Regions:
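Metal-dependent amide/peptide-bond hydrolase catalytic core
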Residues: 1-138
Length: 138
């Protein structure tokens, strides 16, 4: 079993093709049978530019600190499926420095984040529902 990850769908397709060719060549040379199956295939998550801008401006208005990550998250994410059917944006709220990450055994959700995060989501929802300019541009 192997886990493959790529930033773009095209890169993943090429990676799977090349790896399959190499493994098949090795199996053939050793006289072995080979069965390849893909499970939990997730499309890449690509943020819509307009929605990303809307999240940024709304977060700034709410007094949030905005930090850009240098590299995309490498975990599997089924959120990419949404982007195939409608504009979407995936962003993190963040718990700040000094907190164990999500899957760490000592992770404990910081409840202080709830009010601010819910308020941010509420404002984003209102803008997308009632602001005709926001709707037109997305």
């Amino acid at each position: 079993m192997v886990t493959l990850r790529a930033e773009k769908d095209e890169d993943m397709e090429l990676l799977v093709l090349r790896l399959t060719e190499k493994v098949r060549k090795i199996a053939d040379a050793a006289g072995l049978g080979l069965e390849i199956a893909q499970t939990e295939v997730f499309p890449s998550t690509v943020n819509d530019e307009h929605l990303t801008g809307l999240v940024r401006s709304t977060a700034r208005e709410a007094g949030s600190q905005i930090l850009d990550i240098e590299e995309p998250f490498r975990w599997s994410e089924d959120f990419g499926h949404f982007g195939r059917i409608c504009p979407s944006v995936l962003f993190g709220i963040g718990a700040g420095l000094g907190h164990p990450p999500l899957h760490h055994p000592e992770f404990d959700f910081n409840d202080v984040l709830l009010d601010h995060s819910v308020g941010l989501m509420k404002t984003l929802s209102e803008k997308l529902t009632y602001d005709s300019a926001a709707l037109r541009e997305s």
